[in-house]
Amino acid sequence: MKNLLLVAALTATASLCAATPDSIPFKTMDGTETSLKAYAGKVVLIVNVASRCGNTPQYAGLEILNKKFAGEGLVILGIPCNDFGGQEPGTNAEIKEFCTSKYAGTFPLLDK
């Protein structure tokens, strides 16, 4: 019985170890399913963004970084989140419109 439990525990542990952060799927705002594997060999900056946050002007700085370093392998991924004080209540379409019209954002935004 102990051997059976040991084998079960090792099997469960092995399956947990097989999942690496770059294999976890996520969606972009346009609904495309991807993972960090798509950005292999690049420097990825993951940023929590919100359009009603005191740090919202960071979009401008992020876009400057994006334009300056995208050609050198930098990828900025904006992750809109409404979990911190309800500062991102909009839909994906509203968030994208806000980013592009107010800050001329071109870096990828992920699904909220």
Question: Where would I find each of the regions flagged by the language model?
Answer:
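Positively charged n-region of N-terminal signal peptides that target proteins for export
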Residues: 1-5
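Hydrophobic h-region of N-terminal signal peptides that target proteins for export
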Residues: 8-18
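Local sequence-structure signature of Cys/Sec-based thiol-disulfide redox active-site neighborhoods
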Residues: 40-47, 55
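Aromatic-flanked redox-active Cys/Sec active sites in thiol-based oxidoreductases
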Residues: 47-52, 81
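Structural microenvironment flanking redox-active thiols in thiol-disulfide oxidoreductases
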Residues: 55-112
